[in-house]
Amino acid sequence: QYTYDKYEKLEFDLNTIDSGLINSRTFRGMEFIFDQVDTSRITGNTYLPLFINEAFSKVYGDNIINKETEVLEGNKNSGFENNQTFIELIKDLYADFDIYDNHLKFFNVAFTSPLSKTGINVYNYVLLDSAYLGDKWCYNIIYYPRRKNELTFKGDFWVNDSTWAVKEINLQASKSANLNWVREIYIEQEYDVLNDSTFLITKDYMLSDFSFRKKESANGMYGKRTTFYDNYEFDIPKEESFYKENIDPYEFEVYNRPDQFWEERRMEALSKDEKGVYKMLDTLKTVPRFKSLYTIGALIASGYYEFKGFDAGPVFSVLGYNEVEGLRLRLGGRTYFGQNDLWRMEGFGAFGFKDQKFKYGLSGKVLVSKKNRKILFGGYRKDIEQTGASLTNSKDVLGRNRASSGLITVGANDRLTSIELTTLGYQMEPVKNFTFRVLGSHRTLKSASETFSLSYYDQNGDIKSTLKQSELELGINYTPGRKTSGYGVERRVINGGDFPSFFLGYTFGLEDVLQSDFDYHRIQALYTQPWNVGGLGRLYTTIELGRIFGTIPLGLLSPIPGNQTLWSIYNTFTQLDYYEFVSDTYASFHLKHNFGGRLFGRVPWLRELNLRELVGFRAVWGQLSEPNNSINVGIDNLPIRYQSPEDIYWEWSAGVGNIFKILAIEFNYRGNYLNNPGIRKIGVTGSLSFSF
C-alpha cells in the first residue's frame, strides 16, 4: 500500500507573439493582455499565458489488489464557468504514462518508448557520458529514431549502473512524426531514490506546441502540464471498499478553496506571468470584442448559438434532403443555464418543401437524485425517418440518423417512415459506468412514400397500412474506463472512442396496450472495443447479436443497416441498400483499422503528405422466419417477401485518411450476393474528422 501528494498545474499559452499579432484587428481593444508575455525555456519562443488550472490531490494505491484512487482536495482555474469540461479534456490528452511501457499514448496515438523491449528496432542508442547523480553512478545515453515519419522520440536519459533504473529522462517527439496540429512534444521526468533499489517519480513536465501550420514562425498554442509528487508513505492499509470510485464526486468546497490552501500546498510557486493570468482573464471577460469572439468559438465547438438560458441549434442540422420531404428546414433549441443543469428541455420544428408538412418534437429530462444518478426522461416526436439504419435500437426520442436527410445519396432514398413516438423512462447508475434503464414507448408507423410499403396482414387476413405498437424495454450498459465531465443531468464524455462498451437489452411488445397491435419479445446485445495495436495503429471492432420471438411485420423487424449516403457511417453496410436484407435473428461483425501512416511513411514521395492507411471488413449473418416473411404486403397490396443474409453477407474497404488533415476517402467493395438486382459492387464514401 502507498500514498502520496500530487500537485498538478495545467497551462495554455498563445505563442510566437510578434508585433504583427499584437497590432492585429483580432486583439484591438485587448492590447493590455500582452503585458504578461514571457519566453519559453524549451523553444525560445515568446508566449502569452491564457489559461491556468491548479489541482491538489491525495493518491492512494494497493499493489496487492491492483487498485488506485485519487482524491481531489482542491481545484482552482482561471477563465469561465464552463472551464471544467475543457480541463478534463486536456487532462485526458495529457494522461499519465509509464516510460517503461512499450508504447506511450499521447493525443490518441501510440509512440514507441525508448525504453521499450522493441526500442532497438526503431531507435539508435549512443553512450555519451557517465557521472554521479547524487550518490548514484549513472550512464548518460542519447537516442534518436532510425527512420522518419514514425511515432518516435529523440532525447537522452540517465540510468543507474546497478539497478538500471532511470534517474532522469527527456523525450522530444520527432519533427517528422505523422501527427496533426502538433509541432512539438517535449517531456521531462525526474526520479529520487527511496532506497538502494526503488526510484520514485518526483517531477513530470510536458509541453505541447499546437499549431495549424508546422512553420516555426506561425502562431500556435502551448499546452503545458507540470506535476510534482511528494510525501510518499508506505504500508498504510485501506479497506478494499475505500478504492471504489464515486459516481458523482463533485464537491463545491473543492473548487472554492481559499488562497491560504494553495500557498500551503503548492510544490512550486507561481511565476509572475502565471499569477497575472487570473486577474487578466477577469478583465478580459468585460471586453465586448472578446465576448463576440468567445460566442463565435462556442458556436463552432458546440453547434449551438448561446442566448441567456437558451441555446439555438444545432446549426449543422438546419438543412437536409430526402425524396419524401425534398429540401428540409429544421430549427431547434434547448434550455441551457450552465453545463451542470439539473434539468433540460429540447425541441425542434421542421418543414419539408416537397411534402409541405410540418414535423416537430419535444423532450425533457431531470436529475431527480445525484446519488446513483437517477434520471427521469420522456418526450414526443412526429417526423419522417429512415428506420432500420442501425441494428441496436436507441429510442432517442429526438434522435435522427444521418441517413434520414443526407444532402447527397446513392440510389433511391424513398424507403422512409412516418413516425409518431412517445417515450417515458427512468435511468440510474448504481455502479460507476454501469447504467440501468427502463423505458416505455408507443409508436405509430406508416410508410411516408407511395413507393414503399409497411403494410401487413392482421389476424383476420385484412391489410393494415398503419402499425401501432407499445413496448417496455429494459437495458443495461457498461462502459469501463469511460471518463465524464460535469455533474448535472447531462455529462460530457471526454475520452470517446477510448473505452469498450457492453449493451444488453430486452424489449417486450405489449399487445392491446394503447391499441398496440403485437405481442413479441426482442433480445439485443452490442459490444464495441477499441484496440491500440502499438506501432501498427488503432483498431475498432463491434459485435451485434439479436433475436426476435413472435410474429411481427417489417416495421418491427431488424433490417440489416445499409448506407445510401456518401458518408462513411460506422456499423452500417456501405454497399447495401435500405431493406435489401431483413432479419429477425442476426449476428454482425465490424472491423476498422487505421495504420496511422505506418506503411505510407516508408515511401519517400508519400512520406511528406502524412497520409494514413485505412482498412475495414464487415460481415453479417441473419435469418427471417416464414411467419415474419409472409405477413408483409407490398405497394400493390400483394404479398412481398424479403431476403435475409443466410449465407453471411460481407464487404471490405480500403482507403486513405488524413487528406488535408481532415478528410478520409474509402473505397468499398461488395463481397457476395452479386446477382441481386440493382446492387452496387463498388462505392466511394468519405468522412471529415478533426484528430491528431
Predicted regions mapped to residue ranges:
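Edge/loop elements at the starts and ends of beta-strands within beta-rich repeat scaffolds
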Residues: 1-2, 98, 134-136, 150, ...
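Hydrophobic lipid-interacting interfaces of membrane-associated proteins
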Residues: 9, 146, 176, 207-212, ...
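Short, hydrophobic/aromatic-rich segments at coil-to-beta transitions
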Residues: 134-142, 166-170, 198-203, 341-344, ...
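Short, surface-exposed coil-to-beta transition loops
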Residues: 151-154, 183-188, 222-225, 358-361, ...
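Short aromatic loop motif centered on NTY/YTY
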Residues: 173-174, 179-225
